Amino acid sequence: MNAYSHNLLKEKYPTKQDVITEIMNLEAILHLPKGTEHFVSDLHGEYTAFDHVLRNGSGSIKQKIQDYFSDRMTEQTMQDFALLIYYPEDELALVKKKLRTENELQQWYLDNISHLLEFLELSGSKYTRSKVRKALNPNFVYITEELLYNDPQEFNKRSYINQLLKNILKLDQADKFIIATCYTIQRLVVDHLHVLGDVYDRGEEPDKIMDRLMNYHSVDMQWGNHDLLWLGAMAGSKLCMLNLLRICARYNNLNIIEDAYGINLRHLSRFAEEQYEDNPQFRPKLTNGDGYRFNGEKLQITQIHQAVAMMQFKLEGQVIARRPELKMDDRDLLNKIDYKKNVINLNGKEYSLQNTCFNTVDPKNPNELTDEENAIVDELLISIQHSTKLKRHLDFMMNKGSMYRTYNGNLLFHGCIPADEEGNFCSLKIGSKEYSGKKLFDFSEKMIRKAYSKPNVKDDFATDFMWYLWQGALSPLFGKKSMTTFERYFIADKACHEEVKNPYYKLRENKDFCIKILQEFGFAGDDTNHIINGHTPVKRGHNAICAEGYMLVIDGGYSKAYQPTTGIAGYTLLYNSYGLQLVSHQPFTSKQDAIRSGKDIVSTVRVVKHELQRKSVADTDIGENIKEKIRVLYNLLRNYD
């Protein structure tokens, strides 16, 4: 330790006893049980379902209730108690309607406050008192600690405790105290949240998800392909921006742009109305219960959808020409059309085109935007980059996010490791350098951060590369040979709609391939390590646990569009001191249904790995940091003057 570091530590620990106290505290912390990690993925803007999963900790709260209260509560009482913890405001309102007399309500308050305090003590038992205190509502720290750490059966304190409880009721604080305690329990049951990508996509409330995450106590994120479109737009990529606008129009979610983020689409709407007519291929796709806000909105969105799609295809051609190293010439599609015959040549085969909307395309220079299109794109990008709320959300996503994360022996990422049929990692050549495996992830993250840090630079390689990450064949976030958006719009032959997956998705069933990936990212690759992967829904009949447990696929299945394919609403993962648990969920209808029916959406919990010896903080990454700090403090102690 150099003299400067030594002096800094002495300032923090001014006496020898301060050093001893801190060492004792840290060494004790190492023996506490490991905190629970909660893994979710592919939220796709579905806020209410995601919020429910956070509130119930993927079933962990209900499980703790059953373990602790099953000999004292009926099944119905346990269900009601769980719902109280999930949705305290709603459950309190329901209870007040059910109970007939003031005495019944007072007794209900006393019973449930007592149960909540017991459950709070259980939930906080794996943490230091200091950490529990930080999780408490500031308005109730003193009274909660007095009730929590005193035995009501102790004779000398019995009257004191009873009076505290009576005063909570007498001063009309029962509701506030119960609500605060329930949210503290939610916070303590899960120590850390991992979000494996795609907050954004077709769902209508990604902004609420971002607000929720920004207020969450401990979270990290691994970026998904849909997230990259929004990050790319904020970084200055017009092409990323047009893609996200097209997706919002396609799924009738332009209100995200206009209402949630305050971006004006008036010029775009007027231009689309002038240039485009109704087109069945571009009508919005509606999910159950979805509809239109006003007469004529369906046509308006259909026209906007066509306008942004055509601008997107033009700019794709421009970026492809500007970046030959990305080898995407096969996607310069507007240059492959015979506009007189209305056909396109793809891979040596000619296809007729249908539902075309090439009004603004100049056959001699098909990738050129018109003057008005240029003006619209520039205006929209300025509006997006100046949306205070969107900037706040995406800055948070950048700060908390990464292409991948290694955490407590596990490797987390959203998409894939591009590979060939033999299991060799594919290389992307940029200039004189080649990037594959971990290096490809690191290079991708470097480009994302570079582009995001220079939002006024709109045509550099880093900004263009963000679009490549959306749909490039060797993108770790895409995982397919090509994105056939154009073909789906304009070609009837469904054979050319197919998007061929990278061999990775077959190879990840193989144990040796998964071990190879783990070793690529610095792990030993033994049975203490796992890959946790999102991005692809687990289809009905397929297994979320692959390669003898080395690979866990946890696409959350929040998007309603995928649920008929999967048969469920996807998976989440819990990793506590006892091991790994894969949780499958049933589709979430609404908060009101959950409260009214009393049913949860957790259907099955499957133990992936049960630890023979319960894991402690010492076995975690945080534990390693604490051990290093202890070593430094012992060194300081030995050399203390």
UniProtKB/Swiss-Prot annotation:
Gene3D superfamilies reported in the protein's UniProt record: 3.60.21.10
Taxonomy, superkingdom: Bacteria
InterPro entries, alphabetized: FBPtase_class3, Metallo-depent_PP-like
Segments passing through the bilayer: none
Pathway(s): Carbohydrate biosynthesis; gluconeogenesis
SUPFAM superfamilies per the UniProt record, alphabetical: Metallo-dependent phosphatases
Class of enzymatic activity (EC top level): hydrolase
UniProt KW Hydrolase keyword: yes
Cofactor(s), by name: Mn(2+)
A GO term for molecular function: fructose 1,6-bisphosphate 1-phosphatase activity
Example GO biological process: gluconeogenesis
Enzyme Commission number(s) from the entry: 3.1.3.11
Catalytic activity of the protein: beta-D-fructose 1,6-bisphosphate + H2O = beta-D-fructose 6-phosphate + phosphate
Keyword terms: Carbohydrate metabolism, Hydrolase, Manganese, Plasmid
Family the UniProt entry places it in: Belongs to the FBPase class 3 family.
UniProt protein name: Fructose-1,6-bisphosphatase class 3
Gene name per UniProt: fbp
